[in-house]
Amino acid sequence: IGSGLVGSEMCIRDRLIIILQFAIKRSSRNHKSRNQQFLERESRANQVRRKDISNLNYISIPDNLPLINSGNETFNQLLSNNSGMMRSYNTITGLKDKKILNLTGISNTELKLSYGAANLTELTEYDDNFTTLIKAIASLGHALIDNNDTADALSFLEYGISIGSDISSNYIDLAIIYAATDRFDDIRKLKEKAGMLKSLSRDNIIEQLNNMLK
């Protein structure tokens, strides 16, 4: 009986080894196939000629955002006393004359296929400008709330959402302002907007907004 059990165990072990070897080989083949497909697609992308990108959906920074030295004494005083807030504000205003594009969720290969490899450097710069902008907006909006300036925070945070920010604090801070004045329909609209995001932060944002609606 003992030898029979040993033989049975060895048979099972041998089967498991064969199955494992097969799975490894199949995984290796799939990986090679995906890698080959990527290389072929990347090669095609690198051969696409430069295309006109002047009519893309560029983001502009509006003139109706709160400004220093415009008669808003609360805003002036807060920024003059807080270097972090002033830094975020200067970042935002410093991007006014730069090109900004929200290219979140679009790979470099896709950009080259759509607009030509020669445009990749410029497009990456414009997307980096977008990332810099939404970070500064979220930071400034949060700081304004902390300093009880919800009116100015509202302006910046709503602008951030309007241009497609995927920063969690932008959504949550804005929802907090809405909740304080029972604007729950606006929180629901925020949730709909968050559902359109292509970022990893989407599910977490939606979950937090759902909790605020309970």
Which residues does each predicted region cover?
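N-terminal topogenic membrane-targeting module
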Residues: 19-122
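Single conserved hydrophobic/aromatic residue that forms the stacking wall/gate
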Residues: 1-7, 11-12
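TPR alpha-solenoid repeat register
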Residues: 169-170, 204
